[in-house]
Amino acid sequence: MDPDYGSALFWDESGCNIGDFDCFFIGDLGNSTKVDLTEIDGLREWFLEWDVESLYHPNHWTDSQWKDWWERGLKLAKEVKTLMSENVNLLYFTLQDPIWEVRPEEANDGGLFNYGEPMKIE
């Protein structure tokens, strides 16, 4: 679970987008399972906060705002995991230290970078 442009939020192990804040698909094309996310309160809003911030207000959030947003996303990822089969892993993005560092203004890149290893959601 890692937000990106174009409503992309979920990715398979090869890095292909498999869904957004409404649903995602697990499995092979033609034989996949749809995971409906519309009942997860706040997921769409959480994603759209990132989308607006990264596209229209790069580097506008403070470090504490990024941290709060990331922590809310972690809670949402745990809710998403409850809708999935136990044999399917869900990874949530992390950032290396300094965790909440943002790019300089001229980078115009939304603030999140310095990715670390994804966190497995149990």
Predicted features, each with a name:
Residues M1-E122:
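Intrinsic low-complexity, intrinsically disordered or marginally ordered coil/linker segments
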